[in-house]
Curated annotation (Swiss-Prot):
Highest taxon of the lineage: Bacteria
Domain spans labelled S1 motif: 623-691
Record's protein name: Polyribonucleotide nucleotidyltransferase
Name of encoding gene: pnp
Provenance organism: Aromatoleum aromaticum (strain DSM 19018 / LMG 30748 / EbN1)
PANTHER family: POLYRIBONUCLEOTIDE NUCLEOTIDYLTRANSFERASE, POLYRIBONUCLEOTIDE NUCLEOTIDYLTRANSFERASE 1, MITOCHONDRIAL
A GO MF term: RNA binding
UniProt entry tagged with the keyword Ribonucleoprotein: no
Listed EC numbers: 2.7.7.8
Catalysed conversion reaction: RNA(n+1) + phosphate = RNA(n) + a ribonucleoside 5'-diphosphate
Amino acid sequence: MPTAIKKTFAYGAHTVTLETGEIARQAGGAVIVNMDDTIVLATVVAAKEAKAGQDFFPLTVDYVEKFYAAGRIPGGFFKREGRPTEKETLTSRLIDRPIRPLFPEGFYNEVQVIITVLSLNPEVDPDIPAMIGASAALAISGVPFDGPIGACRVGYSGGQYLLNPTVEQLKASELNLVVAGTEAAVLMVESEARELSEEVMLGAVVFGHQQMQVAIRAINELVEVAGKPEWDWQPPAKNEPLIARIKELAGAHLEEAFRITSKQARTQRINEIRKQTFGVVADGVEVPPTGNELKDIFHDLEAGVVRSRILAGEPRIDGRDTRTVRPIDIRVGVLPRTHGSALFTRGETQALVIATLGTGRDEQIIDAIAGEYRESFLLHYNFPPFSTGETGRMGVTKRREVGHGRLAKRALIAALPADEDFSYTVRVVSEITESNGSSSMASVCGASLAMMDAGVPMKAHVAGIAMGLIKEGNRFAVLTDILGDEDHLGDMDFKVAGTENGITALQMDIKIQGITKEIMQVALAQAGEGRIHILALMKQALASHRGEVSEFAPRMLTMKINPEKIRDVIGKGGAVIRGLQEETGTVIELQDDGSVTISSVSAEGAQLAKEKIEAITAEVEVGKVYNGTVVRLLDFGAIVNIMPGRDGLLHVSQIANERVNNVADYVKEGQAVRVKVLETDERGKIRLSMKALLDQPAE
């Protein structure tokens, strides 16, 4: 029997166990992580050789949730897990981002990391165990990897940081931050906050990095007893003569090219320089250098040109200094028949953002392994190939689009109105029509404007900005509002979104080690300046939300009824509610607590439906006079309808002062009559009288 090797450590209020050696033994590395009964299996398999002609690092990370982990059977016809959910896609990205920069430069062997959720404690999100498991599996596999990493979640409540709060604790927390890093440095941050200060956010990152050291130590201890031999892999030796030759041929030309401020013109010129340089280098050589070798050297030369100029204090690629935001142009209400729209342009990045209002029936129903839930705020980010002047496939939503949409959504949640104040379902779509860096933050700005334009009573405008970093030794420069090239050639991508009052979302991806607390402090402060500048421009374009929703949006009315009256509104087989909806042209939604939502394109129709529901659910009052209709004659009286769904008995003795021998001599079916309520009993039966009225008017 195989023997499992285990390492256990306390992690906040949780106990975490790392285990290897019993399951998935044919994988390059396999670790089971148990965090208070949330259990994941993380496996790593790597190809021993890179494919011929491979010119990038083919790392794949797949996080997979199994319904059996929560004791559930999947819905749908096939009753099995299907394509990745949004949660699976986002968690896969969360794992990928901190481990990718730790593989050595020039390592092009295919690596696949698969994390499978085997058991779920509803109070423990599997994402942190999954990140720890992926790190541990890589560490014991022997694959070239400069880890391990640790990861943890940080909450903030009552002025105190919480380590790995439960799902229930997070509901009351002002912060939901995931941080990952090595023993020496933070590599990745993903967070959502309720307008917190830069100091609190930075403190959370530092707190998380300190606390994750226990996980890193446990992984290192596991490697000592269960680690496989490290691969005998060496990076390709640098061809110094070739590097010098390419620099001689292309260096001066690249210096000039990176002074071209237009992205398309600059890209075209760089491509020309690359083509000319490679042609000259390969000409007349017996063994020409490989494409990978040439590409890597040219990339390093590009990076050197851009980075050295910025660190020397020279203007950036587009002529700006390090703190200036690109020119911004804002238009709202650009699409006449949509509920709300905005066109947000920042330099060569542009987002056309549309807000649509719907009813409760438009909420997204999500069948997660922990149980079904509904989302009333949706944000979708689309990045078509034409936005960068390229061709490409359409149709399938890419992981990057899911991730950018989620970041923008998290940035806006803190500013949304409460459900009881605004019961609409809101869907925002960001169409990126031009891109040269920071399109996700343009989506945040555009979404805030579009929702305000749609009449959504946002608490405040939300703006986002992307920061970059260039660092060489002890010299560094933080860049405000980075371009695509600065993101590609820099050391950090640092996105911050928030209101005037504080930060609502922070995302950080760091490609190098050695980013200190002081550098992050400078970056956050500089991002705050940029955010306030953008917010001022947004307020100039649209200071507050529209006074009312678009004429094309559904009108919503909400009311509360006695839950015991719900069946009266629905009627037998749904007949009453169907009739109401057809008569008034509305959609009526009932909740178990008696909440009623009425939606209609017509405000008059919604009001009419509300009045009719009030009539149906009104309580019959003893002593009150009603105008009723005779619905049926009996030998001993008549049945009279006095309110929608409420009938009473008009006894023969209560029809007239004299003796009534034949009811039909006094009332007919369909006849309008005035009656007084004499009595109602505990079973809801109603006794009526015509005789008691005499000449009393109907109330």
